[in-house]
Amino acid sequence: MRNLKKVFSTPDDKEYFFGYYDKSPLNYKNNKILAHAVGFNDRIPDKNDFCDLGFFDLSQPDTFNKLSTTSTFNWQQGSMLQWLGPDHTQKIIFNDVDSYGKKFISKILDIDTSEEKILPFPIYSVDLLGKNAFSIDFERHYWFRRGYAYAGIKNKKKSEYFDPHDGILILNLESGSSKKIISLAELIELNRVSSMHKAAHYIEHVMPNKSGTKIAFLHRWKFETGIHARLIVSDIDGADMKIINDSGRISHFNWRNNSEIIAWGASVNPFNSMRKFSSLNKFIIKPLLPIYKKVIGRNSLQGNSKISSLISGDSYLRIDINSGKNSSFGKD
């Protein structure tokens, strides 16, 4: 691509990574990049693994400036490491486990003074002002989404498929107080369908909008024939809950502004709607699926589909928001 300039490359001594796409490793001054540093990359982290946290200063890009360590991280989202608002320059926040190894916590760290504040809960996301954070039950998440969970606490009491008390918490970063705003029990009663029965329910990707007045999140459940996901939006107190996409196939999304969301997913159609119902899945969709695959061809790969007989490399799409037209670039 034209007009690209190499800023820095990570050293070869460790494996460096950041985390999920919804958080930026860059501070607001665009001169420091946050990173995790570990000594392996060939397995899922376990409870005995530690990860260094720090940053690269772009004026001295060859040096990793270590700030802290954590044993609470995964490959997908790291330790939820991020710059803390409102300035997104002076302080960072990340997840860890307490000194007894019994409870997940989060820490706020001043990168200049090393002053540390310990909060009695882990965080999933933080609003841009650095006022409120949002969280889920990470102990329970371990049993259903291992790649997005933490290995530090293996609580078998949280392995039940359904826990009506699980849900989303709002966390006040100043006072350290927390309050449940949405429960799994409420989510199941929101347009309840038969596939929810005896399914493993969990919540992921809780994201506040730009002003911190609303959150968007995914409610997922694993049932006999697959996983159904729906995108839901609510006020930060849990009020005015609305299902935005109920196609069953919705994953990566982000707030474009305070009232618009851009997302990868499927559109709602009769076929996707049938997947929510256990009997239709068992007696209609599952028997017909092999025929459907044969008709559309085994060599068809689009978007985030499963690989059949072709392997597709990475490429990027440039999408015009107004026209919907797209073009690819940066292909392998």
Residue ranges and their predicted role:
Residues 28-29, 85-88, 128-129, 210-211, ...:
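Residue-level detector of Asp-centered blade-edge/turn motifs that repeat once per structural unit
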